Design a protein with these regions (language model features):
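Partner-binding and oligomerization surfaces adjacent to conserved cores of proteins
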Residues: 1-197
Length: 197
């Protein structure tokens, strides 16, 4: 994945109470992605992968794919993915309005090198993608298709199909609808369910 945010400053638009918490408690709080303004995007990403895999499959493989996705989404839908949103844009009117208490909040500048140290072994910093073409060319697509067509999972790399789907679910949090593209978003993403395994 692209790290075009590396070495740059990242900006977090928020209210004064969040600023107090960040400074006073020396903490960054992540939100459950399903509680954010783009909660449907995770399911949309999974459906995009499903649709792409189904193209060109036999009827039996098509049914197997849909059954597998239904089972996996049922397993994962309550697994939390937490994120904190940043932007590459320092002074963006839309984000002031949307995230900084209608322009009466703050825009905090963060150093990416320090954020990477904070996130090490606990969370990832990922650029957000706004196009489904990226999702349609994702590695998950080929891994799941290989499982559907050949019953194969690279056990050394992944262990089993559940691990591939868990990773796919986590990645779904960095895909958003193209209407948000102007935000130039980068996210810290944490997966507590993945840390347990």
């Amino acid at each position: 994945m692209s790290k075009d945010w590396k070495g740059k400053k990242l900006y977090h638009y928020t209210g004064y109470s969040a600023l107090e918490g960040i400074i006073g408690n020396k903490e960054l709080w992540l939100c459950n992605v399903k509680a954010m303004n783009d909660k449907a995007e995770m399911f949309h990403y999974m459906d995009t992968i499903r649709t792409s895999i189904c193209n060109g499959l036999s009827k039996d493989q098509f049914r197997k794919t849909n059954t597998l996705f239904d089972e996996q989404i049922a397993r994962l839908k309550d697994q939390p993915v937490y994120a904190m949103s940043f932007s590459l844009l320092q002074d963006d009117a839309a984000q002031w309005e949307r995230y900084a208490v209608k322009g009466k909040g703050v825009c905090i500048q963060f150093n990416t090198e320090i954020l990477e140290k904070i996130c090490d072994k606990h969370a990832l910093i990922k650029k957000v993608y706004y196009t489904l073409r990226v999702a349609q060319k994702n590695e998950h697509l080929e891994l799941i298709r290989k499982y559907i067509t050949d019953g194969y999972v690279d056990e050394l790399a992944w262990g089993n199909i559940n691990a591939i789907f868990s990773n796919c679910w986590a990645c779904s949090s960095i895909y958003k609808h193209k209407s948000f593209k102007s935000e130039a978003e980068v996210r810290i993403v944490s997966l507590p369910f993945a840390l347990k395994t």
